[in-house]
């Protein structure tokens, strides 16, 4: 008996005829056949449900010979347990060496199905027309293919490992660059913070000196006036007392009394009225920060006052044509003032836009934001109560007017380039002179009542021009 046949016989002896696998907890029936304990019990349980067969009480037929065997007579077969365990562990006795269907050695290889088969499988209908090779010949052929694949995969693995190393190096270098950039950002921002602290201290010192210098002049002027006021009070009191005396007493030394009044000369000090605080509220870099919120604001032609002209420089055309006689009075058009609003409304977020101005000597204008539902037909005060948060330039271009109290903000120079910053959530609108980066004024409140629109207004035909983005706006004269 050759080794293959011996292996086949040992596999047969160690194999359960019910599950066709190596024995697990084998037991022997009264008739001498062996089965897995679980397999024979399941077989007998199935037999209970079959009808038409009478069985002795507690006895069941053997699956091999059909001889009745008492269930309680099942005896463990420890020797077969060891044989089955040896068969599991021995490489030459693996179940995969036998055909699962025919329990024959797998000696052939079906190239069509790419699987080992036995001699019985080759004669079966399933494989009869397939290309079949001896197992060893197929193994040699496929071994060459596998070696080629292994060689290719090893080359690919080397490439992958090389790329992996490069990627790891790149990752490390990237993390180092990010770390360096982070440190640089922190360092530069720390420099900016220190610079701003120093600049704040410097500007406050300049303001304090300006305050003290002007305050000293004002106090000197006030002290001089106080002294003269006391002297005048004394002379006035003397004259009043003399005027109430008897005629004789009143006329005695009247010449000296009158000379005292004549000799007193009231010295009116030069009135110190500072036109404007020279120290500007200017934070370095603030305009650049605000420009990160910049919007491309465009005036809405349909909202423009009938004689307010809008000219688009890129397209070289009028957005609101020069009116012939009178322009159409739509519900969106301002008719009481030469005003217009932006095309886009804002109901959240932060927004910044700029307006350039080429104004004349008697310029009148207003800039800011307004509610989207403000009155466009009636003349109303442009105040927050009426839905306007705007600053106005009074005649002479030296004072910004703030409604509703007509508070005046005196300017050192008339602004020719204004920046407007809206922080909707904060309820704040701020105005800046882009020329020198100074802050001019802010409106603050708890919350805005609804969507806001950019607001533009020119006061008269000779007020000059406003430039909003690529649109130039002026009043037809």
UniProtKB/Swiss-Prot annotation:
The reaction(s) this protein catalyses: S-ubiquitinyl-[E2 ubiquitin-conjugating enzyme]-L-cysteine + [acceptor protein]-L-lysine = [E2 ubiquitin-conjugating enzyme]-L-cysteine + N(6)-ubiquitinyl-[acceptor protein]-L-lysine
SMART domains in the record: BBOX, PRY, RING, SPRY
Pathway(s) annotated for this protein in UniProt: Protein modification; protein ubiquitination
Protein EC: 2.3.2.27
Subunit field text: Interacts (via coiled coil) with TRIM44 (via coiled coil). Interacts with TRIM28; this interaction prevents TRIM28 activity on BCL2A1. Interacts with TRIM41; this interaction prevents TRIM41 activity on ZSCAN2. Interacts with BECN1. Interacts with NFATC3 and NFATC4; these interactions prevent NFATC3 and NFATC4 nuclear localization.
Keyword Zinc-finger in annotation: yes
Record function comment: E3 ubiquitin ligase that plays important roles in the regulation of neuronal apoptosis, selective autophagy or cell proliferation. Stimulates the degradation of kinetochore ZW10 interacting protein ZWINT in a proteasome-dependent manner, leading to negative regulation of cell proliferation. Inhibits autophagic degradation of diverse known targets while contributing to autophagy of midbodies. Autophagy-inhibitory activity involves MCL1, which TRIM17 assembles into complexes with the key autophagy regulator BECN1.
PTM annotation, UniProt: Auto-ubiquitinated.
BP terms from Gene Ontology: autophagy; protein autoubiquitination; regulation of protein localization
Coiled-coil region list: 135-226
Annotated GO MF terms: protein-macromolecule adaptor activity; ubiquitin-protein transferase activity; zinc ion binding
Induction comment: By NFATC3 and JUN cooperation during neuronal apoptosis.
Zinc fingers (B box-type) by residue: 94-135
Family affiliation: Belongs to the TRIM/RBCC family.
Ranges of residues in domain B30.2/SPRY: 276-475
GO cellular component, one term: lysosome
Main subcellular localisation: cytoplasm
Residue intervals of every RING-type zinc finger in the record: 16-66
Binding site for Zn(2+): 99, 102, 121, 127
CDD domains xref list: Bbox2_TRIM7-like, RING-HC_TRIM17_C-IV, SPRY_PRY_TRIM17
UniProt-recorded name of the protein: E3 ubiquitin-protein ligase TRIM17
Compartments reported by the entry: Cytoplasm; Lysosome
Keyword line: Coiled coil, Cytoplasm, Lysosome, Metal-binding, Transferase, Ubl conjugation, Ubl conjugation pathway, Zinc, Zinc-finger
Organism: Mus musculus (Mouse)
InterPro entries on file: B30.2/SPRY, B30.2/SPRY_sf, Butyrophylin_SPRY, ConA-like_dom_sf, PRY, SPRY_dom, TRIM/RBCC, TRIM17_PRY/SPRY
């Amino acid at each position: 008996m050759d080794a293959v046949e011996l292996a086949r016989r040992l596999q047969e002896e160690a194999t359960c005829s019910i599950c066709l696998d190596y024995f697990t907890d084998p037991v022997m029936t009264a008739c001498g056949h062996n089965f897995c304990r679980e397999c024979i019990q399941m077989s007998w349980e199935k037999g209970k449900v079959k009808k038409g067969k009478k069985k002795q009480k507690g006895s069941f037929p053997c699956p091999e010979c059909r001889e009745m065997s008492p269930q309680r007579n099942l005896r463990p077969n420890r020797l077969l347990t060891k044989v089955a365990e040896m068969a599991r562990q021995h490489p030459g006795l693996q179940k995969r060496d036998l055909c699962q269907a025919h329990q024959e050695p797998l000696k052939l290889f079906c190239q069509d199905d790419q699987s080992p088969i036995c001699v019985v499988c080759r004669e079966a209908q399933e494989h009869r027309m397939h290309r079949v090779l001896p197992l060893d010949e197929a193994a040699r052929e496929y071994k060459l293919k596998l070696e080629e694949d292994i060689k290719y995969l090893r080359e690919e693995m080397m490439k992958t490992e090389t790329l992996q190393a490069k990627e790891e190096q790149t990752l490390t270098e990237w993390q180092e660059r990010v770390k360096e950039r982070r440190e640089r950002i922190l360092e530069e921002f720390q420099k900016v913070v220190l610079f701003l602290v120093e600049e704040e201290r410097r500007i406050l010192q300049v303001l304090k000196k300006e305050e003290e210098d002007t305050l000293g002049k004002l106090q000197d002027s006030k002290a001089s006036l106080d002294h003269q006021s006391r002297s005048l009070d004394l002379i006035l009191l003397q004259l009043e007392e003399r005027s109430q005396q008897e005629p004789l007493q009143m006329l005695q030394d009247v010449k000296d009394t009158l000379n005292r009044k004549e000799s007193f000369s009231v010295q009116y000090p030069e009135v110190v009225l500072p036109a404007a605080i020279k120290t500007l509220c200017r934070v370095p870099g603030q305009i650049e920060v605000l420009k990160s919120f910049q919007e491309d604001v465009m005036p809405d032609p349909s909202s423009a006052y009938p004689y307010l002209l809008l000219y688009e420089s890129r397209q070289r055309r009028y957005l609101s044509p020069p009116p012939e006689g009178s322009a159409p009075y739509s519900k969106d058009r301002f008719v009481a003032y030469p005003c217009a609003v932006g095309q886009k409304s804002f109901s959240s977020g932060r927004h910044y836009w700029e307006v350039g101005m080429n104004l004349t000597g008697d310029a009148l204008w207003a800039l800011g934001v307004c509610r989207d539902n403000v009155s466009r037909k009636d003349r109303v005060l442009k105040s927050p109560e009426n839905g306007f948060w705007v600053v106005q330039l009074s005649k002479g271009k030296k004072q910004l007017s703030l409604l509703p109290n007509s508070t005046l903000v005196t300017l050192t120079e008339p602004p020719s380039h204004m920046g407007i910053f809206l922080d909707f959530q904060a309820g704040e609108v701020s105005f800046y002179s882009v020329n020198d980066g100074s802050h001019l004024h802010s409106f603050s409140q708890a919350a805005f009542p609804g969507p806001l629109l950019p607001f533009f207004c020119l006061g008269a035909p000779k007020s000059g021009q406003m430039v909003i983005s690529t649109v130039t706006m002026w009043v037809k004269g």
